[in-house]
């Protein structure tokens, strides 16, 4: 399979259209999630990061594979990365969603990451309301690893968004 390393805005919207067919809760995360919070694309993106209701893991994987995706990294139950010959990469992260809006995600050591309800929100991008990780959640999710240049870029935007929120 030829692997494309860039997800365009049109590709992102196609992936989100596919996610919408499930009727499940999901949130855009990662670099595209930051750009959606800002309301415009600010850099190139290698993948689309999606956090989703873990109860749909098997159905989501079957659908992605039937649409031409191929699993490239399988770290279940933490994350699964898939590649599509035209739409590039999608990195899916199963979340256990609690009734109070909080959630948790398995970690690689057999434990859990716990997430507050206000980490989950939405933003308008290209005239469309997209469920995404909030700026507060993005700030937390951008911890615990060494930053690449794209992460530093995203953090500057997250800090800008958080400072704009605090001045409101």
Summary of predicted features, one role per range:
Residues 20, 65, 124:
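Anion (oxyanion) recognition and catalysis
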Residues 1-28, 156, 160-168:
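Helical scaffold of the NTase/Pol beta-like nucleotidyltransferase catalytic core
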Residues 56-62, 103:
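Short, conserved charged micro-motifs
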Residues 33-34, 97-98, 137-139:
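Short, solvent-exposed loop/turn segments at secondary-structure junctions
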Residues 61-69:
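A short alpha/beta connector and helix-capping loop motif
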Residues 16-48, 53, 59, 134:
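Active-site nucleotide-donor binding segment shared across nucleotidyl transfer reactions
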Residues 105-168:
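Catalytic cores of NTP-dependent nucleotidyl/adenyl transfer enzymes across multiple folds
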Residues 69-103:
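Conserved catalytic core of two-metal-ion nucleotidyltransferases
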């Amino acid at each position: 399979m030829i692997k494309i390393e860039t997800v365009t805005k049109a590709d992102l919207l196609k992936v989100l259209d596919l996610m919408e067919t499930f009727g499940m809760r999901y949130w855009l995360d990662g670099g595209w999630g930051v750009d959606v919070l800002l309301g415009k694309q600010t850099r190139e993106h290698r993948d689309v990061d999606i956090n989703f209701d873990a109860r749909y893991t098997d159905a989501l994987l079957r659908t992605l594979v039937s649409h031409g995706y191929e699993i490239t990294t399988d770290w279940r139950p933490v994350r699964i990365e898939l590649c599509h010959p035209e739409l590039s990469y999608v990195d899916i992260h199963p979340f256990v969603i609690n009734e109070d809006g909080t959630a948790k995600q398995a970690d690689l050591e057999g434990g859990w990451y716990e997430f507050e309800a206000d980490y989950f929100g939405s933003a308008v991008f290209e005239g469309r309301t997209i469920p995404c990780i909030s700026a507060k959640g993005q700030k937390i999710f951008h911890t615990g690893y060494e930053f690449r240049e794209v992460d530093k870029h995203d953090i500057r935007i997250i800090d800008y968004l958080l400072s704009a929120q605090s001045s409101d």
